[in-house]
């Protein structure tokens, strides 16, 4: 039986995805592979994720189910920027500077979006998306997981970073995308065929 490969070298992301998928009776064992994939520059998160998934599938043995995840943080006042480029912003500048990009705007609203792109064992590609609306705030809580400390979901008084993991996973963009992915993985069409009998 093949493994279900999650392309990531990010230990925090792997831990969170294991939590999000862990309660399901997955058809394959989950492993990670830190492949270095080219990222296409595109406005569409689906296009970026599908490009990465196709690249990953081409580098793995045929029939290996593989998925990638891509996330965007879209500031409404900036027309959706930084969007899919948020991870480069996080690497290049402190979170307080990212939050201050909205200082000149009255609206601090934003959307957090995740797309999971999956290539199943038959070679078919699928995407699953989740969105959470909220607002950008000065950093609050631990700053060791991306931009969680500056995103406060709508209707909440805590940033993702201040929430316990179960609460965050229940309402987050990533949680929503992986709930749809988990449902697909557990569908009868995704079950591996039984071993051939002699």
Swiss-Prot record:
Record: residues binding Mg(2+): 39
Record key words, sorted: Cytoplasm, Hydrolase, Magnesium, Manganese, Metal-binding, Nucleotide metabolism, Nucleotide-binding, Nucleus
UniProt-annotated binding residues for ITP: 8-13, 52, 70-71, 87, 145-148, 168, 173-174
Gene3D superfamilies registered for this protein in UniProt: 3.90.950.10
Matches recorded under SUPFAM superfamilies: ITPase-like
Signal peptide (UniProt feature, chain positions): none
Cofactor binding note from Swiss-Prot or TrEMBL: Binds 1 divalent metal cation per subunit; can use either Mg(2+) or Mn(2+).
Major location category of this protein: cytoplasm
GO cellular component, one term: cytoplasm
Coiled-coil positions: none
E.C. code: 3.6.1.66
Disulfide-linked positions: none
GO-annotated biological processes: nucleoside triphosphate catabolic process; nucleotide metabolic process; purine deoxyribonucleoside triphosphate catabolic process; pyrimidine deoxyribonucleoside triphosphate catabolic process
Alphabetized GO MF terms: dATP diphosphatase activity; dCTP diphosphatase activity; dGTP diphosphatase activity; dITP diphosphatase activity; dTTP diphosphatase activity; dUTP diphosphatase activity; GTP diphosphatase activity; ITP diphosphatase activity
Family matches, as InterPro entries: ITPase, ITPase-like_fam, RdgB/HAM1
Cofactor(s) named in the record: Mg(2+); Mn(2+)
Reaction catalysis annotation: ITP + H2O = IMP + diphosphate + H(+); dITP + H2O = dIMP + diphosphate + H(+); XTP + H2O = XMP + diphosphate + H(+)
Annotated HAMAP family: HAM1_NTPase
Similarity comment: family membership: Belongs to the HAM1 NTPase family.
Record note on quaternary structure: Homodimer.
Protein's job: Pyrophosphatase that hydrolyzes non-canonical purine nucleotides such as inosine triphosphate (ITP), deoxyinosine triphosphate (dITP) or xanthosine 5'-triphosphate (XTP) to their respective monophosphate derivatives. The enzyme does not distinguish between the deoxy- and ribose forms. Probably excludes non-canonical purines from RNA and DNA precursor pools, thus preventing their incorporation into RNA and DNA and avoiding chromosomal lesions.
UniProt name for this protein: Inosine triphosphate pyrophosphatase
Lineage: Eukaryota, Fungi, Dikarya, Ascomycota, Saccharomycotina
């Amino acid at each position: 039986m093949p493994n279900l490969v999650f392309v990531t070298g990010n230990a925090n992301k792997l831990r969170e995805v294991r939590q999000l998928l862990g309660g399901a009776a997955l058809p394959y064992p989950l492993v990670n592979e830190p492949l270095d994939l080219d990222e296409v520059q595109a406005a569409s998160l689906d296009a970026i994720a599908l490009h990465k998934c196709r690249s990953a599938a081409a580098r793995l043995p045929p029939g290996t189910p593989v998925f990638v995840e891509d996330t965007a943080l879209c500031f409404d006042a900036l027309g959706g920027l930084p969007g899919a480029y948020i991870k480069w912003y996080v690497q290049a500048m402190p979170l307080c500077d990212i939050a201050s990009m909205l200082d000149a705007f009255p609206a601090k609203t934003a959307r957090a979006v995740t797309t999971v792109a999956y290539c199943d064992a038959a070679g078919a590609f699928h995407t699953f998306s989740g969105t959470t609306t909220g607002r950008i705030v000065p950093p609050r809580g631990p700053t060791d997981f991306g931009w969680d400390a500056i995103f406060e979901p709508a209707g909440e008084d805590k940033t993702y970073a201040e929430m316990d993991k179960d609460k965050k996973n229940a309402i987050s963009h990533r949680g929503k995308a992986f709930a749809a992915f988990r449902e697909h993985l557990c569908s009868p069409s995704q079950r591996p065929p039984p071993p051939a009998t002699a």
